[in-house]
């Protein structure tokens, strides 16, 4: 198992050499510090505790400051454990090149908050008849039998939706920019912009695609039309996509859910 911590920057799109448009999410992956190494003998399970992004020391408690000093690093903002990951020692640095283009990963983050909503949107209830005489349209409906004389704890009711831990599995890594410390992941990932996420090796173990298969995959073979001018793929589309997305989000306000 391998994994890394990052921050969601935003979404963009790139074009493959065969003209396919690929929607991608840019994840900024700064250098991760191995804070602690947990073993089965001492802790009961095997894991690495990773930390990323500096934090003011005045915002860190004394016990936490001691943990960072043991790893010879400054206080960090985002700390997470990744289980069944080994091969590193306390104080080691993990970079974006731990993954390769074509690999499949599982991304875990906190979903966007959507505020207070009704039972139809929150729990996918069916609404009542919308005619004027029905007297029931978008209500909760029956809340239980008469006998308990109360509403049971498990009853699905209106309330807050979002800001929950969500994992999306088997997302493909389209490209890696080691200079800008960025990963381009196919599709969307949970959370708003500037949200911290955990990227781990896909647990279901899909066979990774090689970069040549990824960029030169074609749906079907067609005979070229001599009347249509062939457009060559633009070089550096990955760098351009990363630069544009990073620039667009640099001055954006921080998310409330962070």
UniProtKB/Swiss-Prot annotation:
Q: Which GO terms describe its cellular component?
A: cytosolic large ribosomal subunit
Output the Gene3D superfamilies linked to this UniProt entry. Answer: 3.30.160.810, Translation factors
Per the record's keyword annotation, is Secreted included, yes or no?
no
GO molecular function terms noted in the UniProt entry: rRNA binding; structural constituent of ribosome
Can you tell which superkingdom this protein's organism belongs to?
Bacteria
Sorted alphabetically, the keyword list is: Ribonucleoprotein, Ribosomal protein, RNA-binding, rRNA-binding
- Which Pfam families does the UniProt record give? Ribosomal_L3
Biological process (GO) annotations held by this record are:
translation
Q: Which family does it belong to?
A: Belongs to the universal ribosomal protein uL3 family.
Q: What does this protein do?
A: One of the primary rRNA binding proteins, it binds directly near the 3'-end of the 23S rRNA, where it nucleates assembly of the 50S subunit.
- UniProt subunit comment: Part of the 50S ribosomal subunit. Forms a cluster with proteins L14 and L19.
- Please give the NCBIfam families that the UniProt record associates with this protein: L3_bact
- Name-wise, this protein is Large ribosomal subunit protein uL3
Q: Which organism is it from?
A: Spiroplasma kunkelii
Q: Which gene encodes it?
A: rplC
């Amino acid at each position: 198992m391998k994994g890394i911590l990052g921050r969601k920057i935003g979404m963009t799109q790139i074009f493959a050499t065969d003209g396919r448009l690929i929607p991608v999410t840019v994840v900024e992956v700064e250098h991760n510090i191995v804070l602690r190494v947990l073993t089965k003998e001492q802790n009961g399970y095997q894991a690495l505790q990773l930390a990323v992004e500096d934090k003011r020391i005045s915002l860190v408690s004394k016990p936490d400051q001691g943990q960072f000093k043991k790893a010879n690093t400054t206080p960090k903002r985002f700390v997470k454990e990744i289980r069944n990951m080994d091969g590193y020692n306390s104080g080691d640095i993990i970079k974006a090149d731990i993954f390769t283009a074509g690999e499949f990963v599982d991304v875990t983050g906190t979903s966007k908050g959507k505020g207070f909503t009704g039972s139809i949107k929150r729990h996918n209830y069916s609404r009542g008849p919308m005619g004027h005489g029905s007297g029931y349209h978008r209500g909760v409906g029956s809340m239980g039998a008469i006998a308990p004389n109360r509403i049971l704890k498990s009853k699905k009711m209106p309330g807050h939706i979002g800001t929950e831990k969500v994992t999306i599995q088997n997302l493909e890594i389209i490209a890696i920019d080691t200079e800008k410390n960025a990963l381009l992941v196919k599709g969307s990932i949970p959370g708003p912009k500037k949200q911290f996420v955990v990227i781990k090796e896909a647990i279901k173990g899909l066979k990774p695609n090689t970069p040549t298969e990824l960029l030169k995959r074609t749906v079907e073979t067609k005979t070229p039309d001599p009347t249509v001018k062939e457009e060559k793929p633009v070089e550096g589309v990955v760098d351009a996509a990363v630069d544009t997305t990073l620039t667009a989000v640099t001055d954006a306000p921080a998310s409330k859910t962070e």
